[in-house]
Amino acid sequence: MKTLLLTLVVVTIVCLDLGYTRECYLNPHDTQTCPSGQEICYVKSWCNAWCSSRGKVLEFGCAATCPSVNTGTEIKCCSADKCNTYP
């Protein structure tokens, strides 16, 4: 009976995946495991002086809430693993 109870506890912990954290892109190719409490993935994009030749500047990351942006900055926030891709 104790073995059965222990087995049920282990299965429950594995199924619940306690301590799960979000995984977001850090750049267009690499991901990072977000710190506890940061469940939002985001990608910011904006133009700087070299936008016409290099394209937009991109910033990827994790956050507890969707970051605020300035005029001229685009942001995409999402709450699934690896959802902060950029086309």
Curated annotation (Swiss-Prot):
It holds the Pfam family Toxin_cobra-type. GO terms for molecular function: acetylcholine receptor inhibitor activity; ion channel regulator activity; toxin activity. InterPro entries: Snake_3FTx (IPR003571), Snake_toxin-like_sf (IPR045860), Snake_toxin_con_site (IPR018354), Toxin_cobra-type (IPR054131). This is Alpha-elapitoxin-Ls2a. Binds with high affinity to muscular (tested on Torpedo marmorata, Kd=1.6 nM) and neuronal (chimeric alpha-7/CHRNA7, Kd=3 nM) nicotinic acetylcholine receptor (nAChR) and inhibits acetylcholine from binding to the receptor, thereby impairing neuromuscular and neuronal transmission. Also shows a very weak inhibition on GABA(A) receptors. Expressed by the venom gland. CDD domains: TFP_snake_toxin. Its main location: secreted. Belongs to the three-finger toxin family. Long-chain subfamily. Type II alpha-neurotoxin sub-subfamily. It comes from Laticauda semifasciata. Disulfide bonds join C24-C41, C34-C62, C47-C51, C66-C77, C78-C83. One of its GO terms (cellular component) is extracellular region. It comes from the Eukaryota.
